[in-house]
């Protein structure tokens, strides 16, 4: 390449990327302007806007009321089960939402949707790299299509859910951990606690694994990240933890706070005791797998991390369909192990499997959309199906000496 072409490419590529990003925002803005503002992003934008523009706490009741007026055109009727649209995130999350609060709502929503779309693709790319798996061109295209077209991803984008960004933070964090970039991995995993119920499982597992694997620097950087977020946010607003807890209490009578396990227990008439018993059983089994993962081996670490992700999606509160985008990691691990075992011959079956999974997620969710209630079969069924898939590939994923040996014949 000549020096002139080198200079042109150095400038042209960033310009093209910026042009593509601007086009994506414009397309998303057209969608936002045609769609009602009944999405989760409304409450987060109101919180960021009030804090950055008016210096009003995002937990102030007036901020929730503004979000309710934007969504319902009136105050929420909690007796009907309407979401009070509280900010409901830890104060450090303002590092994401405050800059968006500087933009008018429609533009901010379009920018946020664009960021989430990029996050979904980027997290898929990182997971594939972490698993050392590269499919054929057709398989890659099918996988990228699945990334944004199955129902949890669609709902995450339309509602402006943080789960897509959470997927990227976790993917980047684990990628850095395996590359032994302790500072980057620790800080990214600390940032994953911006949505605590989604990040806590993997953060606890990585901390446990790092302690017993001699990765003290990783633990130190993770603790530093958590301490910085907590300390700086408490300096800005010492009372925010109690204000957030009060907002959580406002959801106690609403179905949205239930975990998938709690929904199952409720439907079976087992009540809170059933929820605690099922959750305790799942956690006990998970802890047993955590103990077996000690030793620092990459294959067992990744498989256990994927299992942790799937199990925690069953037991954490505020179980919503959008959170299931985090299942992409265990799904990729399952398909990757299958692919490594049988080679390119699995292309067609794997693509059919992804198509069936995407179709099922839509078919099972369509009826629930009219009732504004998540599908029980999607919320509970998909994580359970994923756990079954992980158990199916457990031997290949944890006993082979290298990922490349997954294709070796069984003895």
Language-model regions, residue ranges each:
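Primarily membrane-embedded glycan-assembly and transfer machineries that use lipid-linked glycans
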Residues: 1-177, 182-183, 208-328, 332-339, ...
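Charged/polar, low-hydrophobicity segments characteristic of intrinsically disordered regions
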Residues: 131, 206-209, 242-249, 357-376
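Central hydrophobic cores of alpha-helical transmembrane segments
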Residues: 188-189, 221-227, 304-310, 347-359
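Transmembrane helices and adjacent periplasmic/lumenal helix-loop junctions
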Residues: 189-207, 316-323
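Membrane-embedded alpha-helical segments of transport systems
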Residues: 194-198, 227-232, 349-350
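Aromatic-enriched
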Residues: 333-411
């Amino acid at each position: 390449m000549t020096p002139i072409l080198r200079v042109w490419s150095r400038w042209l590529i960033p310009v093209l990327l910026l042009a593509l990003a601007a086009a994506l925002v414009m397309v998303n803005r057209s969608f936002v302007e045609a769609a009602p503002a009944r999405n989760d992003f409304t409450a987060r934008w109101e919180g960021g806007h009030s804090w950055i523009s008016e210096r009003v706490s995002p937990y102030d009741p007036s901020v929730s009321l503004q979000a309710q007026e934007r969504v319902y055109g009136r105050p929420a009727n909690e007796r009907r089960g309407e979401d009070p649209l509280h900010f409901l995130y830890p104060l450090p999350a303002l590092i994401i939402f405050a800059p968006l609060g500087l933009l008018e709502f429609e533009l901010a929503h379009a920018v946020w949707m664009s960021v989430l779309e990029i996050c979904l693709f980027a997290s898929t790319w990182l997971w594939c790299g972490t698993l050392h798996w590269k499919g054929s061109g057709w398989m890659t295209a099918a996988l990228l299509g699945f990334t944004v077209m199955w129902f949890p991803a669609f709902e995450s984008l339309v509602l402006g859910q943080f789960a897509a960004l959470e997927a990227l933070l976790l993917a980047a964090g684990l990628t850095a951990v395996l590359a032994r970039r302790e500072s980057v991995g620790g800080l990214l995993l600390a940032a994953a606690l911006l949505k605590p119920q989604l990040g806590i499982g993997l953060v606890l597992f990585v901390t446990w694994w790092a302690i017993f694997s001699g990765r003290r620097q990783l633990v130190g950087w993770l603790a530093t990240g958590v301490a910085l977020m907590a300390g700086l946010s408490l300096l800005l607003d010492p009372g925010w933890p109690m204000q957030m807890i009060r907002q959580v209490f406002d959801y106690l009578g609403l179905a949205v706070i239930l975990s998938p396990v709690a929904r199952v227990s409720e439907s079976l008439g087992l009540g809170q005791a059933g929820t605690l018993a099922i959750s305790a059983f799942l956690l006990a089994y998970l802890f047993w797998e955590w103990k077996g993962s000690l030793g620092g081996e990459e294959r067992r670490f990744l498989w256990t991390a994927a299992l942790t992700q799937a199990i925690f999606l069953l037991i954490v509160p505020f179980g919503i369909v959008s959170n299931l985008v985090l299942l992409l990691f265990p799904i990729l691990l399952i398909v990757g192990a299958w692919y490594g075992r049988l080679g390119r011959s699995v292309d067609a079956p794997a693509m059919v499997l992804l198509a069936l999974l995407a179709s099922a997620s839509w078919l099972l969710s369509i009826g629930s959309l009219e009732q504004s209630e998540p599908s029980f079969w999607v919320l509970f069924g998909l994580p359970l199906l994923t756990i079954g898939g992980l158990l199916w590939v457990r031997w290949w994923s944890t006993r082979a000496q290298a990922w490349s040996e997954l294709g070796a014949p069984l003895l």
